[in-house]
Amino acid sequence: NIEVGHTPASIRESLLEKVLKMGDKFVAAVKKEYAPGIIGPFSLQSVITKDLELIVYDVSLRVPGNPIVATTSPYTKYQYGQTFGVGRRIAMEIKRAQEEDRLDEIVT
């Protein structure tokens, strides 16, 4: 299979916990192998089989997407009460880390 385009999508709610656990496992594995671990946005580029098995085929260690695809997540509104792009979220997280004197945890 080859990637032939980008289409934003949301995941079935019944699969959301599985997807989030995959992300958590990736973060933990990277932290174990390459301290301090991954800092910043990433995407586990995946496919879902007809049997609803999730298969990661690539990791994008940057803000995922392309200029044509919106750079926001449908879940941002649930967490923050509003919709905005990844850049604003990163800025908010940096500001919060500064206010909490935790910049050393998010900057290398």
Name every feature range the model reports, one short phrase each.
Residues 89-108:
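Cysteine/selenocysteine-centered motifs that mediate thiol-based redox chemistry or coordinate metal-sulfur cofactors
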Residues 32-68:
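Conserved metal-phosphate-binding beta-hairpin within the catalytic cores
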Residues 24, 51, 58, 101-104:
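Acidic-enriched, low-complexity/disordered segments with a strong bias for Aspartate over Glutamate
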Residues 4, 8, 43-46, 95:
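Generic detector of bulky aromatic hydrophobic side chains
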